[in-house]
Amino acid sequence: MRVLVCKDYDGMSKKAAEMIAAQIVLKPNSILGLATGSTPVGMYRDLVKKYNDNIVDFSDVMSFNLDEYYKLPISNDQSYDYFMKENLFNHVNIKPENTHLPNGMADDIEKECMNYEASIDAAGGIDVQVLGIGRNAHIGFNEPDTKFAKRTHVVELTESTIEANARFFKSREDVPKKAVSMGIGSILKSKKILLLASGEEKADAVYNTVYGDITPEVPGSILQLHKDTIVIVDEAAASKLNPKDYKLV
């Protein structure tokens, strides 16, 4: 696990976008694992700029998103399908048929989970997986005590996650109580992982992910065992780390 510390959120976003762009230049048909939420918005903004500046071409890229809310129509402006179109897909030349999210509206949700996992494997696996991290160190929607071997599955969201996501909805009651998420086992199959975090409220989660015991109580801690994980954080999120353990960029 390598840790890169940037001055602020914009610096973190630019560094992550640089790494994604470099991956696409190196392998134009890269398979990207993408995340939603407020953390990667700046990264997507910078990737769109790189596309507009003819630095990166998404025409052969394929993507698989980490998660989607359960039984929230994709037409809803809080669905992750909607988020991805608004923040990235509608602004670059990625082919719609090459973008994939779990279908939270599927009638047979267990079959959908198995099919989604199989689709990732059939594509050749994820080259670079982007992750955010929750205050409780959840990755994807894998909450504390999720088994590390878990593959794509239906998740009951914790009260803290519902509370954190309530700011995106009209009211707390509107936040879905379940989601479909890649499992930790799915995430660990990725060839490279970029974990992004910003803000002082993420400092404990980052500390426990980097230094803590590897335990399901801290889902991010399993990334210590991944062969190529890069943690990209701003100074506030890195505030509890020992400076000798990271590189300022």
UniProtKB/Swiss-Prot annotation:
Signal peptide: none annotated. One of its GO terms (cellular component) is cytoplasm. Gene3D superfamilies: 3.40.50.1360. Pathway: Amino-sugar metabolism; N-acetylneuraminate degradation; D-fructose 6-phosphate from N-acetylneuraminate: step 5/5. Keywords: Carbohydrate metabolism, Hydrolase. The active site is at residues 67, 136, 138, 143. SUPFAM superfamilies: NagB/RpiA/CoA transferase-like. It holds the Pfam family Glucosamine_iso. Catalyzes the reversible isomerization-deamination of glucosamine 6-phosphate (GlcN6P) to form fructose 6-phosphate (Fru6P) and ammonium ion. Belongs to the glucosamine/galactosamine-6-phosphate isomerase family. NagB subfamily. NCBIfam families: nagB, PRK00443.1-4. This is Glucosamine-6-phosphate deaminase. It comes from Clostridioides difficile (strain 630) (Peptoclostridium difficile).
